[in-house]
Amino acid sequence: QRYNPYKYIELFLVVDNRMVTKYNGDLDKIKTRIYELVNILNEIYRPLYIRVALVGIEFWCNKDLINVKSASSVTLASFANWRESVLPNRTSHDNAQLLTAIVFNRGVIGSAYPAGMCDPNRSVGTVQDHSEINLQVAITMAHEIGHNLGMGHDNNSCTCGGYSCIMLPALSDQPSKYFSNCSYIQYRDFIMNQDPQCILNEPSGTDIVSPPVCGNDILEVGEECDCGCPRNCQDPCCNAATCKKYSWVQCESGECCDQCRFKGAGTECRRAMGDDPGGRCTGQSADCPRN
C-alpha cells in the first residue's frame, strides 16, 4: 500500500439565522457562496497536503439553536457544546464552523480553539460573514481552521515570501493565500505531538455535499479520478482535464502493471525462492500469478 501524505478535513458548516436573514432566505445563494469558499479553502491548504471536503450544511432558518452573542468566546463555547451533543449522531465529520452575520465585539471576525482538531468538544470555529468578497471570508475560515490545526498567530519573524500571511492577528487589506514558515512548523508539531486520527481517512465521494469540482484533488461523484490541476497531476492514468481515466488504461497498480498498462507476458514479477518457483506476468492481468 502506497504512503498517502494527505490529510482530509471533513467539514460541516452551520449558517445562523442572522445570515439566513441577511440573504433574504435565499438558501441557494448562500450554498453557492459556501461552495466557492470551500474551493478557496482547498487552494489555500493544498501546499500543506490537506484536502477540505464539505460533508454537510445546516441552515438555522427559523431561529438559532444556540445563543449567538456578540462576545465571540461565548458563541464559540455554545457552538462547541451544541456540536458535541447534536452533530455526531447525524453526520460524520471532523470539524464544524459556524457562519454568522452577527458583528462580534472588539473587531473580532472569527474564533477557534487552538489545536482542537478531532477533539469532540474543541474541533470548532466561528466565522463572521464580514465581507462580500469571498476571498476575505475564506481566509478568515482558513485562519480559524489553522488555529484548530495548532497554528498560532504570526509575529514579525514569520514570512510567506513577502505576502500578508494567513495567520496574522488581523486580516490585511491585501490578503494572500499563503501560510508562513511559522505556521508550517506549528502544524507539523501538532501532527507529530497530537497525532489527530480523524483527518487520516479519505471521505467517500458520496459523503460530499458540494458539487463535484474536477481538479480539486478529491474524488467525487461522477469522477473516475481527480489528480488536481493538470500541471500538478502525478497520476499518469488520469486525464486531469476531464477527471476520467484515459481510454487505453489497463491497470493502475499491481506487480504486473507499469505506467497504466499490463507488463508483457513472461515478465518476472516474483523471484524464485525455495519451493516457490517464482512468478511471471501473463500480459492479461496486473496481478502476479500465485502458484
Swiss-Prot record:
Tissue: Expressed by the venom gland.
Domain Peptidase M12B: 7-203
Co-factor: note: Binds 1 zinc ion per subunit.
PTM text: Glycosylated; glycans contain fucose, galactosamine, glucosamine, galactose, and mannose. Sialylated; 75% of the hemorrhagic activity of native bilitoxin-1 is lost upon removal of the sialic acid moieties of bilitoxin-1.
Gene3D superfamilies listed in its UniProt record: Collagenase (Catalytic Domain), Disintegrin domain
Glycosylation, residue list: N89, N155, N181
Residues reported in the UniProt entry to bind Zn(2+): H143, H147, H153
Coiled-coil annotated spans: none
Domain of life: Eukaryota
SMART domains attached to this UniProt entry: DISIN
A GO cellular component annotation in the UniProt record: plasma membrane
Modification sites for Pyrrolidone carboxylic acid: Q1
Residues annotated to bind Ca(2+) 2: V213, N216, E220, E223, D226
Disintegrin domain sequence ranges: 211-291
InterPro entries tied to this protein: Disintegrin_CS, Disintegrin_dom, Disintegrin_dom_sf, MetalloPept_cat_dom_sf, Peptidase_M12B, Reprolysin_adamalysin
Subcellular location: Secreted
Keyword field contains Repressor: no
Keywords from the UniProt entry: Calcium, Disulfide bond, Fibrinogenolytic toxin, Fibrinolytic toxin, Glycoprotein, Hemorrhagic toxin, Hemostasis impairing toxin, Hydrolase, Metal-binding, Metalloprotease, Myotoxin, Protease, Pyrrolidone carboxylic acid, Secreted, Sialic acid, Toxin, Zinc
Binding site for Ca(2+) 1: E10, D94, C198, N201
Names of required cofactors: Zn(2+)
Note in the entry: The disintegrin belongs to the long disintegrin subfamily.
Job description of the protein: This hemorrhagic toxin hydrolyzes the Aalpha-chain (FGA) and more slowly the Bbeta-chain (FGB) of fibrin and fibrinogen. Also hydrolyzes casein. It lacks platelet aggregation inhibitory activity. After intramuscular injection, it acts rapidly to disrupt the capillary endothelium without damaging the intercellular junctions, and also appears to damage skeletal muscle cells. Cleaves insulin B chain at '27-Asn-|-Gln-28', '34-His-|-Leu-35', '38-Ala-|-Leu-39', '40-Tyr-|-Leu-41', '46-Arg-|-Gly-47' and '48-Phe-|-Phe-49' bonds.
Family assignment from sequence similarity: Belongs to the venom metalloproteinase (M12B) family. P-II subfamily. P-IIc sub-subfamily.
Protein name: Zinc metalloproteinase-disintegrin bilitoxin-1
Lineage of producing organism: Eukaryota, Metazoa, Chordata, Craniata, Vertebrata
